[in-house]
Amino acid sequence: MEISINYLLIVIALLFFVVAYFVGIKKQTWMLAGFNEARIRDKDRLARIAGYFFLNSGLFILLNSFISFQGQEQLIPPLILAYGAGVIIYVNKKLVE
């Protein structure tokens, strides 16, 4: 494991933080694609869950912009995708009519 700075990942993490702010705090759920707003039971809860997803993903990406290890490119994207799939499944089970 070595410490190096990957500026592209820092920019991507900052974009995730901006989206987390707008979705989680400002409740701008129009930024989320792939759902019908009329079918959502609790839009505030959806915004909070999606905001936490973007915040956690941004923190994970930011951490990985400073620390690199062997196999990082094969491990990190599937972990974030699996986390996202879990959030999507949870939202579809609990928040969609």
From Swiss-Prot:
Membrane topology: Multi-pass membrane protein
Location in the cell: Cell membrane
Keyword tags: Cell membrane, Membrane, Transmembrane, Transmembrane helix
Pfam families to which the protein is assigned, alphabetical: DUF3784
Major site of localization recorded for this protein: membrane
Keyword Cell membrane listed: yes
GO cellular component, as recorded: plasma membrane
Transmembrane stretches, start-end: 5-25, 49-71, 75-92
Keyword Membrane part of the UniProt annotation: yes
Cited InterPro entries: UCP037672 (IPR017259)
Protein's name according to its UniProt entry: Uncharacterized protein YitR
Organism per entry: Bacillus subtilis (strain 168)
Gene: yitR
